[in-house]
C-alpha cells in the first residue's frame, strides 16, 4: 500500500512538473516572435545503468501519451553484443558510443526534422533495421550520456539525472538483467565492478548539468537481488 501511495504521489508530482514545463514552453518559447522556426521540447534523462531511467521514461509516456517520442541512447552503441571491442571498452565509455551522431539526431528532431535510426535489442544484443522517426511535440532522450556533450546539453530543454543509492541500483539491475536479459547474477556483479571506474569518470559528472535530480534510497533493509 505504501509503495502504491508513493507511486501515485510521484506521478502527481511529475504531472505538475510537466504542466509547468508545458506552460513555459507554450506561452513562453513558442509564443515568442523571435523564434522563427518551431522547435520541439527536449527532455533528457541521464544516469548509470539500472537507476530507473526506463521507469521514469514510461511514467512520462503515461502522462504525455502520443505527444511524446521516446529515444533510448543504447541505440548509439557502436557494436553488437559479443563484439571483440567490448573486451577493450565498457558501454559507459563515450568512445564506445556514437554520441556525436546522437547529438545530431536530437538537434534534427528538435527542429522538427525526420531522422532514421536503429534501436538496440537487449534480449539478443543486436541492432534493429533503420527506422523512420517522426518528431513529436515532446521528445525524451534517455541514456548514459545525454548531458556529456556541450552541444547536446544546449539542445535539451530540461535535464533530469537519476541518482539512485548503490544497493538499490544493484538490486534493480540484477532483477532486470536476470529476468529480461538472460544474465546470471555472477555475470551482472562482474559487469558492475568492471564498469565502476567508467561510471565515476563519465556518468556521475553529468549530474552537475541537471535541472532536476531524482534520488532513490532504501527505507528498509533488503537482500540485494531477492524478489
Ranges and model annotations:
Residues 2-36, 134, 175, 179, ...:
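NTP-dependent small-molecule kinase module
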Residues 43-44:
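Short hydrophobic/aromatic beta-strand immediately N-terminal to the Walker A/P-loop
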Residues 49:
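The conserved Walker
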Residues 53:
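Conserved lysine of the Walker
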Residues 56, 60:
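Hydrophobic positions on the alpha1 helix immediately C-terminal to the Walker A/P-loop
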Residues 62-71:
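Post-Walker A helix-loop "phosphate-sensing" segment adjacent to the P-loop in P-loop NTPases
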Residues 69-70, 78-125, 138:
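Conserved nucleotide-sensing/catalytic segment adjacent to the nucleotide-binding pocket
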Residues 128-181:
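ATP-dependent NMP and nucleoside kinases share a basic, alpha-helical "lid"
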